[in-house]
Curated annotation (Swiss-Prot):
It comes from the Bacteria. It comes from Amoebophilus asiaticus (strain 5a2). Pfam families: GreA_GreB, GreA_GreB_N. PANTHER family: TRANSCRIPTION ELONGATION FACTOR GREA. Residues 25-43 have a biased composition (Basic and acidic residues). HAMAP family: GreA_GreB. Keywords: Coiled coil, DNA-binding, Transcription, Transcription regulation. Necessary for efficient RNA polymerase transcription elongation past template-encoded arresting sites. The arresting sites in DNA have the property of trapping a certain fraction of elongating RNA polymerases that pass through, resulting in locked ternary complexes. Cleavage of the nascent transcript by cleavage factors such as GreA or GreB allows the resumption of elongation from the new 3'terminus. GreA releases sequences of 2 to 3 nucleotides. InterPro entries: GreA/GreB_C_sf, TF_GreA/GreB_CS, Tscrpt_elong_fac_GreA, Tscrpt_elong_fac_GreA/B, Tscrpt_elong_fac_GreA/B_C, Tscrpt_elong_fac_GreA/B_fam, Tscrpt_elong_fac_GreA/B_N, Tscrpt_elong_fac_GreA/B_N_sf. Residues 25-47 are annotated as: Disordered. One of its GO terms (molecular function) is DNA binding. The gene is greA. This is Transcription elongation factor GreA.
Length: 157
């Protein structure tokens, strides 16, 4: 059994929507591509058929992954979150001690992470380093380029 994953209501609904779309529209599109490729004759030398089969495999793997996530997904109740330390759904303002750069991130599940929206995964190196820390503390994060120190300036929800 996979581990339980926690999501915001919005994030879980987005994943459910993706699953529904893939099962209906995605499968229909791939079935149409397979049918068109079959109509072109000999399947042993049919690149379109091979491409459609590969697309089908990728689609089915994503559907299976989303279905597994749904089984183990839980919506986060904000009332049960410790607001004194960094946790999932925390909005964290941090300062890179070496560069002096200040950034704000929201801590989310791996599937909801989107750096462009300022959402980082609690499973990422930075996320793991920040979890459980309090405002004023320094988190040391192991990154490919070496250790990075982040000072936690503020935590909000």
């Amino acid at each position: 059994m996979e581990k339980v994953s926690y999501y915001t209501e919005e994030g879980l609904q987005r994943l459910k929507g993706e699953l529904t779309q893939l099962k209906s529209e995605g499968r229909a599109k791939v079935a149409e591509q397979l049918s068109e490729a079959r109509d072109k004759g000999d399947l042993s030398e049919n690149a379109e058929y091979d491409a459609a089969k590969e697309a089908q495999e990728i689609l089915e793997r994503r559907i299976a992954k989303l279905e597994e996530l749904m089984i183990n997904a839980r919506v986060i109740n904000k009332d049960n979150i410790n607001t004194s330390a960094v946790s999932i759904l925390s909005k964290v303002k941090i300062k890179n001690k070496k560069l002096g750069k200040v950034s704000t991130y929201t801590m989310v599940s791996e599937e909801e992470a989107d750096l462009k929206e300022g959402k980082i995964s609690i499973e990422s190196p930075i996320g793991k380093g920040l979890l459980g820390k309090k405002a004023g503390e320094v988190a040391i994060v192991e990154a490919p380029a070496g250790k990075i120190e982040f000072e936690i300036l503020d935590i909000s929800f």
